[in-house]
Amino acid sequence: MLKLGIIGTSWIPHEFIKAAHLTGRYRLQAVYSRNIETAQNFCEPYNSISCYTDLVDFLDSDLDVVYIASPNALHFSQAKLAILAKKHVIIEKPAVTSPSEWKELVKLAREHQVYLFEAARNYQEAAFQVIKDFL
């Protein structure tokens, strides 16, 4: 069971958590928000979830994978810190704001032997249906 940490407290992470739980391979462990009340409100539907307002403390906790769904401008810095903390990282789209940021994250992920990927859901797009129909 992978211990999951969430950065971001909008509706999107709730949907991600539902999907992650359906796999039977993830357990929500912790949530990070810049505001403790926001974090606590987000955690209400879940049992025994740790809430953090300090990103370093969050990343120092016992997590295997971090899902980042914060404001886009924060994705790069938060992902970089998570990788340096040796956490696998899933970043909501758009993952970063420039190709150079993505290249840096990929390099760091390789060096720290963690997985990194963008949470793109292409299968929901019309173009993907055309490909599916073709196959």
Stretch-by-stretch model annotation:
Residues 1-46:
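N-terminal Rossmann-like dinucleotide-binding module
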Residues 8, 35, 71, 94, ...:
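Structured beta->alpha junctions
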Residues 13, 91-92, 116-118:
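Hydrophobic residues in well-ordered beta-strands that form the structural core
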Residues 26, 87, 113-115:
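Short, well-ordered coil/turn segments that N-cap beta-strands
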Residues 27-30, 64-66, 116:
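Short active-site oxyanion
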Residues 46-108:
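Beta-loop-alpha module in the N-terminal Rossmann-like domain of NAD(P)-dependent dehydrogenases
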Residues 96-135:
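A contiguous active-site-proximal alpha/beta segment in oxidoreductase catalytic domains
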